[in-house]
């Protein structure tokens, strides 16, 4: 997830410091509205998922937590929560929806703090603003995780939002040096050996100091997050530069994937259920294990079903997106041809 925050910051423009309304409108249109629309959709079908067996009260997440059908009161409360706090979404079908809120809060928070810092700093020190913001966010997250504090006005306490703001700022800073970085990795095979080095470091962190943007992250997990997150971004950036120089089907696929990331993000958990059915058949498991979140945990450390989960999580949403657009084109073409016929 840090990769998405860093990338969003990479494309942040200082022009929005004097055009806040446009920036906020874009955030509402691109983050708040999709969150509300799809959270309400999954809220409506939540209880139906129990009727058809996709969800159940026997199997759930890896720690044993399960979900339950909603009462009428819970449905109403979740609806209010969705609109007013960007919470209340279905944890088992929309588990990654926290990202909508995280990026929404992080990006607007970054804009606000940037304006405040510019007001406080002397004009000749204005270039230090992005670094100061990242430092402030790191210190706040350190304080928060060390003392177990919560921002009570933010769902899940605000850790993801603050760390998201830090990574957003890192992306903006990197943009200022992107040209110099590309020159550096363009010499003496630096792109190759730095990519390998970054990959090894990320792998070591994932094995010995596992960390992510879990909202309950400890102080140690907080300390072990920035390095692999930033190096993972640089590794991905190196690879993307290489891919961008080579035309072909792979590049076309990745461009199409990037243009339809939202659909993948919304439906990847639902797509996993197809692979879960296959795994249930293969191992002869209880059919109710399809309710496991996000994937079936049994044998997950031994088998290679993660490959199929990855393919399905990306491929099925993309395939459905492509098919739906083709159908819409056919329908529009049919209506246009019907309308042009003489009566």
Predicted regions and their residues:
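Alpha-helical transmembrane segments and their immediate juxtamembrane cytosolic regions
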Residues: 1-343
């Amino acid at each position: 997830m840090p990769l998405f925050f860093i990338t969003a910051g990479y494309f942040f423009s200082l022009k929005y410091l004097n055009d806040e309304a446009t920036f906020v409108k874009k955030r509402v249109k691109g983050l708040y509205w999709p969150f509300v629309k799809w959270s309400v959709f999954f809220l409506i079908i939540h209880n139906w998922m129990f009727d058809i067996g996709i969800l159940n009260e026997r199997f759930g997440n890896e720690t044993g937590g399960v979900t339950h059908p909603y009462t009428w009161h819970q449905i109403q409360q979740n609806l209010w929560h969705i609109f007013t706090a960007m919470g209340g979404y279905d944890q088992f079908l929309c588990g990654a929806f926290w990202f909508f809120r995280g990026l929404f809060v992080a990006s607007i928070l970054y804009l606000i703090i940037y304006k405040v810092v510019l007001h406080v700093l002397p004009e000749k020190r204005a270039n230090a603003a992005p670094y100061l913001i990242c430092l402030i966010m790191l210190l706040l997250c350190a304080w928060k995780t060390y003392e177990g504090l919560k921002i009570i006005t933010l769902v899940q306490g605000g850790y993801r939002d603050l760390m998201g703001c830090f990574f957003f700022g890192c992306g903006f800073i990197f943009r200022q040096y992107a040209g110099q970085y590309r020159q550096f990795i363009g010499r003496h095979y630096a792109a190759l050996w730095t990519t390998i080095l970054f990959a090894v470091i990320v792998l070591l962190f994932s094995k010995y100091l596992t960390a992510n943007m879990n909202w309950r992250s400890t102080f140690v997990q907080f300390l072990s997050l920035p390095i692999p997150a930033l190096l993972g971004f640089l590794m991905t950036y190196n690879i993307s530069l290489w891919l961008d120089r080579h035309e072909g089907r792979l590049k076309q696929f990745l461009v199409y994937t990037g243009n339809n990331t939202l659909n993948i993000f919304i439906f990847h958990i639902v797509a996993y259920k197809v692979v879960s059915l296959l795994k249930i058949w293969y191992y002869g498991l209880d059919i109710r294990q399809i309710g496991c979140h996000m994937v079936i945990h049994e044998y997950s450390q031994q088998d290679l079903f993660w490959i199929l989960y990855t393919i399905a999580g990306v491929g099925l949403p993309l395939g459905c997106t492509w098919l739906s657009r083709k159908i819409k084109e056919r329908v529009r073409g049919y209506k246009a041809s019907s309308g042009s016929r003489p009566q």
